[in-house]
Amino acid sequence: MLGIVAETPSGGTPGWSTRTVLNKFPALAPDAVAPQGHDPMHETIAAKGFHEVIVESPFHDADLPTLDIAQITDVVTTYHQRFCALSKRPGVEAVVLFRNHGTRSGASLVHPHAQVVAVPLVPPRLQAMVAWGARQGAQTGKCPTCEELARELQAGVRVVEESADFVALVPFAAEVPCEAWLVPKRHSASFADACETELADLAALLGRTLQRLKAAHGDPPYSFAIESAGPGSDARYLHWRLRIAPDIVNPGGFERGSGMPINPSSPEADAALLRASWDIGSLDVGSLDHDSGRGEVKT
């Protein structure tokens, strides 16, 4: 029997639209205990937290970018609900919501799903984001991502699409080919602060961006994660985002040995490729609002 945590009912029909269950093989557990003994050379903590699976559709052969817009909106709304719920649990310092597509990127199940993990510490990547924002913000008094977003929109060369509330872009220092960030225009440190209108806009843009990636590279494996401030953190200069990282090239010895990524393609070329890649037959484009921004589709 599945440990069902939450369900979104299917609009107008029996059954469910999204379902959240406990992970059968959790990386963390609420009753985890710390290892016995103390070794100052090897610091450890209990793997105490929560690990859930968000089932994105009742249909086994569905895929997130090819779902209709109402279903993708249900999915993103469920992301938000579980992110907020787990953020309120005692001892949680950060919530990591991610999705793997393809076995090469770590997907162990074919059925469309995402995962959400609440952890008792701030992950290193988030620590680096917070530190960078604080360092830049101390000099200017402004959010560096907000300033960067304004420059990107003015230049346009790395922008994939602009919607009402978000910008999809390939970042200047993209770590992998066709890496894409979906960044809210409104400054906010936490995904928890997103409103209903923003969630619907994010859902539509996420579907279109994944469809562009699929058309450009033939359905490559990828992972995406929501990079956001944790509950109660002082991250006034952090700006949350959804980061899509395609698994198109294999890291070699230099990357593994140095921790420095090598990206063989330019972000400008990748952004142009994604703008030009649009498989119009695979999305319910008639229900999407494409009237704003670059890379638009008219129906």
Place the predicted regions along the sequence by residue.
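HIT superfamily nucleotide-processing domains
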Residues: 1-299
